[in-house]
Amino acid sequence: DTAAQATPASRTLGWYVWNGQALLDHPARMTTLPKGSERILISFTAPQLRALTRPAGQKRLLQLIAQAHAQGLRVELLLGEATWVLPARRQALLDLLAPLRNLAFDGLHLDLERSQLPPAQQPSWDEAVVDTLRAVRAAIDWPLALTTHYRELQAPDFARRIQDTGVTELVAMVYVSNPVRAAEIARPLLQGPPGLRLAVAQSIERSLPPDESNYLLGQTQALRRWHQLSQVLETLPGFSGIVVQSWDEFKKARP
């Protein structure tokens, strides 16, 4: 078996794709995604995003999304810059989004993490992220999702406050490679407010230690672990799958 076919799976896998331009240039690469893949979260640089708003760029994006949909994949725009939560930087995010709002993405996915802010600004993250998400929700029509560390979701009322901004999905970064332990962490998070979906982010990054990342296990074993984790959680209401950080790192891992 190749890694792509290793584990029969329900369609619960998603992938962070930080080099979206490579996929735009070579859409056929999507056919190498493992079985069970249902979504790609795809990111571009600011100049690449500007190019997508021009007729030629829009045409290529539509072709990519059409091919993805034919494979049963959703395509969500992924943006990640920690400082966007700060009041002084919030408008920069809104300005970036304004010309993009009519593009054919299936959703907008923001990766916003407290730990990536300067230490002095971390205590105000909770309020800042809520205000930012509310502003983004008012500016776009796509479904809106947030990726952040699972510890944020353990705070009382955090998930409800995020849902109140108009976010429909949270992705909890549970960078724990042991699927039993990862399920123990994720299970209570799925007791959140009704209607808010929750996915679990897992890592196959080379730079992380083996207790956090599945990189050293290789593709086939990593897929087995994610399938195991998904099977444990998919009986719980609101579970919306596993999202892997990242597609590029997965391809570098051994089969």
Cite the ranges covered by each PLM segment:
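Boundary/entry segment of secreted carbohydrate-active catalytic domains
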Residues: 2-38, 43, 79-81, 142-150, ...
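Active-site groove signature of glycoside hydrolases
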Residues: 39-48, 96-125, 240-246
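Aromatic- and acid-rich polysaccharide-binding/catalytic face
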Residues: 42, 46-49, 105-108, 112-116, ...
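Aromatic-lined carbohydrate-recognition surfaces of secreted/lumenal glycan-active proteins
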Residues: 10-21, 73-87, 129-158, 197-207
